[in-house]
Amino acid sequence: MLISSFMLVSCGEKKEELTGLHKEFDIIFNEVKEEGVSEFNANKEEIAKEAKNSTRNEKEEKAMLNTYEIMFEAFKGSTYSVENINDMGDKAELQIKVKTVDFIKLTEELLENYKSKNNVSEEEFLMESMEEMLKKVKKGKTPVIEQEITVQMFKENDKWKINDNTKNVLMGKMFGSQKGTLFSF
């Protein structure tokens, strides 16, 4: 009982029962998130090897691994809200807002912090800021960006789906990319 009360308080809001296309999109969103998390987990070992082989020292290696974990945590923590649904039978168009870490504002905050510190080398600042960023992302204490996206859904074999391009844009937004791709923020 105590645990359930704590969980309700920590969520901050009650989750309403989803229905119709909202529920169908929720399934898709969570499948995209699961796929991304699986890819992150599958590549974790490879990333660790790459970090060890491509850096000059342990600090750089740790910074690279922290970057990877920061992106992973931001992606896992991404959420959405449905703003509008246009149901057209076997097709639907949803206006959604994806909420995730605003890396631009977070970086600006860290740079302001750096300016106030005297006698801190760039390397020390990089290490400190990566660790601070990771802590903030894990605790959900970061600036948040809300980005609108139009999602085209279609029904195939009685199952609602989105196409690969839409899925890639959605994943990009879940990572915080304002352009909706994993390679340009």
Which residues does each predicted region cover?
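Short beta-strand edge/turn micro-motifs at domain boundaries
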Residues: N118-F125, K141-F183
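Beta-strand elements of well-folded, non-transmembrane domains
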Residues: V98-I104, K155
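Core segments of small alpha/beta cavity-forming domains
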Residues: E13-V82
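Sec-dependent N-terminal signal peptides
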Residues: M1-I3
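Mixed-charge, low-complexity intrinsically disordered segments
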Residues: E60-E61, D102-I145
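Residue-level signal for tight coil/turn positions that link beta-strands
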Residues: D87-K91, N157
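C-terminal motif of bacterial Sec signal peptides marking the signal peptidase cleavage site
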Residues: M7-S10
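A short hydrophobic beta-strand element
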Residues: D90-T100
